[in-house]
Amino acid sequence: MRPARIIAAAGLALALAFCGTGAWTYARARGDDGLAYGRQRDAALTDGRRAIAVLNTLDASSPERARAGIRAWRAASTGPLRDELGRTEPRTGASARGTVTEAAVTALDPRAGTAKLIAAVRVEVTPAGSKTPTTDRKRLEAVLARTAAGTWKVQALNAVPLARTATEEDAR
């Protein structure tokens, strides 16, 4: 055999071994329960962050925009929270823009389709007739429910009390 054929055969064998190892690794990862759990956790976190930002945002500069904001709230929520938000009357007034700065899934039950999420939210509130917003920081806990479409929506939203720091206690 010529050296060129030996090198080509060795290269082909090496390529086949590499492809076989890749296929075997892919097949194992595809059926990995931990990987599936991680994907669901990531989906809950992504959808939950988006929904919490929506639920802390409202442009109330006009009745039409307030109505659109309330529709967005309803689209981001489910269950009793959605029903409660549906009873909200659109009014003009202060506008708010919520931004989720940090969030984490604290509990996930893929079989039941429920999750809990904690989030730190920065809310910029602009009073009606003012150009200067004030900033407020909130910590929230959300209970999420997976819908039939596979998306996660907020079922309950509660404020988490902030602990006072030593500096704040000294200021009192």
Model-derived segments and spans:
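Juxtamembrane and targeting peptides
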Residues: 1-58
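Short, low-complexity Ser/Thr-rich regulatory SLiMs
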Residues: 13-15, 107-109, 144-148
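Periplasmic/lumenal scaffold domains of single-pass inner-membrane subunits
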Residues: 125-143
